[in-house]
UniProtKB/Swiss-Prot annotation:
Family to which the UniProt record says this protein belongs: Belongs to the pantothenate synthetase family.
Function text: Catalyzes the condensation of pantoate with beta-alanine in an ATP-dependent reaction via a pantoyl-adenylate intermediate.
Record's protein name: Pantothenate synthetase 4
Any single Gene Ontology cellular-component annotation: cytosol
Subcellular location: Cytoplasm
SUPFAM superfamilies, A to Z: Nucleotidylyl transferase (SSF52374)
Pathway it works in: Cofactor biosynthesis; (R)-pantothenate biosynthesis; (R)-pantothenate from (R)-pantoate and beta-alanine: step 1/1
GO molecular function: ATP binding; pantoate-beta-alanine ligase activity
Amino acid sequence: MLVRDRAELRAALVALDRAASSHPPAAAQDAGPARAASRHDRPVRAVVMTMGALHEGHASLLRAARARADQVVATIFVNPLQFGAGEDLDRYPRTLAADLAVCAREGVDVVFAPAVIHDPPPLVRFGAGPLGAVLEGASRPGHFDGMLTLVGTMLHLVQPDLAFFGRKDAQQLVCIRRMVADLAFDVTVIGVETAREPDGLARSSRNVYLTAEQRTEALALSRALAAGAAASADGAPAVLAAARAVLDAADGVDVDYLELAGPEDLGPVRGGPALLLVAARVGTTRLIDNVSLILPTDTQGA
C-alpha cells in the first residue's frame, strides 16, 4: 500500500492494526522480547527508512524486517536536511516505480513516500553533537543533524517496535542508536550487515554514478578494508598500514579518510572491537565503506 502524506499513513497503520485484531499475527509468535514490548499488545511493527533507488542492500533490510515483524513499513524520502551545499540532492536517483516493485516483492505492508516532510524547514532539529563532527561529519557539516531530524520524525510518525538500518553507514547507525538511547525512543534499532556485490563492492544507490572504469577503481575500498582486517592480529598500526598500501596503489581513488574508531562512540580504540572506516571519491562520486574487526587488547589504537 502506497501512502503519500501523514494522514494517509495514520489511516494505513490503523487499518493494519484492525486487520490484525481479527487474525493471529504470524511473526509475533517468535518475536521474543520485541513482542513483549509491542505497544498495547498490537502486532510487532518494523520500519526500514530509505531514500529510494532501492537495491539488494535495501532488499536485505526489508527481508530482515519481514522475518522479525508482523507489519513492515518502508519509507522513501530524499531528505534535503542531510544534503549540504554542492552535494547531489538534485541528481540523487529517484525511481519510485521500481522501488515499489522491490517493496512488493519483499512483502512490505505500507510504503510511505511523501513529497515533503518538513514544510517549512524545521526551526528545531535533532543534533548529533560530537558524534556528528568526525569522519563523515568533518566533510559534511550538518549532515547527521539533518539525518537524525528525519529519522526522529519518521520514528514518531510510524511508531515502530523495530527499526532496521544497514551497517555500511556505520556512523549513521552509531548516531541513531545514541539518539534512541539518550532521548528514550521506544524502539529497538537493529543493524544489518553490509550487502556487497560478488566482487566485494558495497552496494550503494550512488554506485549508478560510476562509469565501468570507475566501478573497477572503486573496488580498492573493499580491498583495503579486507587487507586491514587481515592484519588485525598485529595491531592498529598494521591495520592502517595494510589498508593504506592498497589505497595508495589504486588509480582514481581520492581518499578522504581512513580511520579506526570505536564501534559504540567512534572514539579512539586501544584494543578489542573496532571499526575500520574509509571514505573516498572515485570520479565525482563519494563512497564510504567499513569493516568490523578485533584488535589485540594490548595494542594502542591510532
